[in-house]
Amino acid sequence: MSCFYLDLLKIKDPSFMKRLDIQELEALAADIRAFLITSTSKSGGHIGPNLGVVELTIALHYSFNSPKDKFIWDVGHQSYVHKILTGRANQFGTLREHGGLDGFPKRKESIHDVFETGHSSTSLSAAAGMVIARDIKKEDFYVIPIIGDGALTGGMALEALNHIGDMGKDMIVILNDNDMSIAPNVGAIHNILGKLRTSDTSKQTKTNVDGAFFEELGFMYLGPIDGHDIEEVITNLELAKRAKGPVLLHIVTKKGKGYQPAELDSRGTWHGTGPYKVETGSFIKPAKRAASWSSVISNELIRLAEMDERIVAITPAMPVGSKLEKFAKAFPERFFDVGIAEQHATTMAAGLATQGMKPFLAIYSTFLQRAYDQLVHDVCRQKLNVVIGIDRAGLVGADGETHQGIFDISFLNSIPNMTISMPKDEVEARQLMDTAFSYNDGPFAIRYPRGEAPGVQVVESNTLIPIGQWETIIQPLDAVILTFGPTIELALKAAEQLEIEGYRVGVINARYIKPLDEALLHKILKQKIPILTVEESLLKGGFGASVLEFIEANNYRDVIMHRIGLPDEFISHGSVSIILESFGISTTGLVLKIKEMLAQSGKLRAKRL
């Protein structure tokens, strides 16, 4: 029995591991697993993926010499063990907090984080670039991308496999096969890996049909290997190091290994969590006030699909997060989880639309970026009736730069034929869904944020909202705030506070971001009052920029206008409220800006009420 003990908080770098024997490495794995469970139970985080790669990460740092040898963690949410072994365990108390430890690899955080990830399927292409640079510069180091079986379904990963195999350069690809991405994996490639995973002969011969998939691409295939047997993983890593050309090492792991609630998870619930009770596996959550935005949209989609057999739903590997499981159960023949394949999902929706179907593409804002060409070339250019549910629109908080949903307005605004909308509450969400599926003049995007909806009672209503028509919530007199979605609440609170001080500030619900309500804008501009636009998205190319363009195009002069939104930078992780406050997107920020504009217009005065 080993008496090995190591204070994880005192680790500076991975060099100490070279002195450990297998039994001590196994003890280290147990300590790290316990640390991860205790730490994430307080902070939340991607516990499932990290518990699954404890032994693999230890074996990698034992066999290689980071940072000289380059580890590239595809997606990056499974990099916690790597962070512990590279001297960051003492920062886990700040994991995913504002100014704290990032939940993904971060180059500025450590020399051991050689490439930043967050989205899926990028590691192999990055690795290809590194090995080409290495060989041109005649340098000597290993490049080791670690990619999951879910990420391997992404088209970018397959493009890279094709090129890497053709180049024949030295590279060791680690395929971390845990039979999951966030939700269970789908697709033919997943089925091939499943056959390899359960084959007794695959270790004994390189000529088996399934293993030949990788060998025909030009890779030496090793595996499948038990990813929780440190000694076996190290043995095969050493074998891979001696090989010439690209090697694919197939490692089979168990997501959530060592913590029963996470191990038994088949839905993806333990992929990423908030705080939880270690003893029971129950999540610690504030009392739920209302349904999530995703549920509101999904429930309305089900209602509409019950009345119209042409409605189908598509998701790129996010059925749980997008709350489409109930739809899939109700209409299995009309539900399509295409895997991590945003480009395919978008053009598939276009194809469905050409045949008179009514596709609903449920996709996170951050992942819609990956299908921009398909939106432009295949959907918008052909003016096809595709309804796009843009989930997680706006700031998402703890997941940080790679996942903030702040770019979609800017990149959709510039595409002809695109309609962009965002509801302020559940009623308006249903109305916009009904409007979108009644619209027959091109693509229709509905943005909705992460988290709970406001909790407005939904009544049966078939009211459609005319395209481009805004809602006047408070009639403007002294100034006006134009905004949409969750920032409506901030605007109303600011208007209420300013009314106490004697000012009548209008609030306009600009639920259509594109097209603008031109008639209402003309009316407001003729009042010659200060205009403040507010958006939880980028200012460049955003809603406020569209209003400015309208003002210029219509030759309005001497307009006092200001835009509040997010600056031209990537927004780091942290509490959404703290981030918003830092950019003036708060009740106080709005009040101060309105007063500043009133002073500029000469209307700032003493209280009159």
UniProtKB/Swiss-Prot annotation:
GO annotation, biological process: 1-deoxy-D-xylulose 5-phosphate biosynthetic process; isopentenyl diphosphate biosynthetic process, methylerythritol 4-phosphate pathway; terpenoid biosynthetic process; thiamine biosynthetic process
GO terms assigned for molecular function: 1-deoxy-D-xylulose-5-phosphate synthase activity; magnesium ion binding; thiamine pyrophosphate binding
Superkingdom of origin: Bacteria
CDD domains given in the database record: TPP_DXS, TPP_PYR_DXS_TK_like
Keywords of this entry: Isoprene biosynthesis, Magnesium, Metal-binding, Thiamine biosynthesis, Thiamine pyrophosphate, Transferase
Cofactors named for this entry: Mg(2+); thiamine diphosphate
Catalysed reaction equations from the record: D-glyceraldehyde 3-phosphate + pyruvate + H(+) = 1-deoxy-D-xylulose 5-phosphate + CO2
Pfam families found in the cross-reference section: DXP_synthase_N, Transket_pyr, Transketolase_C
GO cellular component, one term: cytosol
Pathway: Metabolic intermediate biosynthesis; 1-deoxy-D-xylulose 5-phosphate biosynthesis; 1-deoxy-D-xylulose 5-phosphate from D-glyceraldehyde 3-phosphate and pyruvate: step 1/1
Catalytic activity, EC: 2.2.1.7
InterPro entries for the chain: Dxylulose-5-P_synthase, THDP-binding, Transketo_C/PFOR_II, Transketolase-like_Pyr-bd, Transketolase_BS, Transketolase_C, Transketolase_CS
Residues binding thiamine diphosphate: H77, G118, H119, S120, G150, A151, N178, Y259, E342
Residues reported to bind Mg(2+): D149, N178
Cofactor note: Binds 1 Mg(2+) ion per subunit.
Protein family: Belongs to the transketolase family. DXPS subfamily.
Its job: Catalyzes the acyloin condensation reaction between C atoms 2 and 3 of pyruvate and glyceraldehyde 3-phosphate to yield 1-deoxy-D-xylulose-5-phosphate (DXP).
Subunit text: Homodimer.
Name used for this protein in its record: 1-deoxy-D-xylulose-5-phosphate synthase
Name of encoding gene: dxs
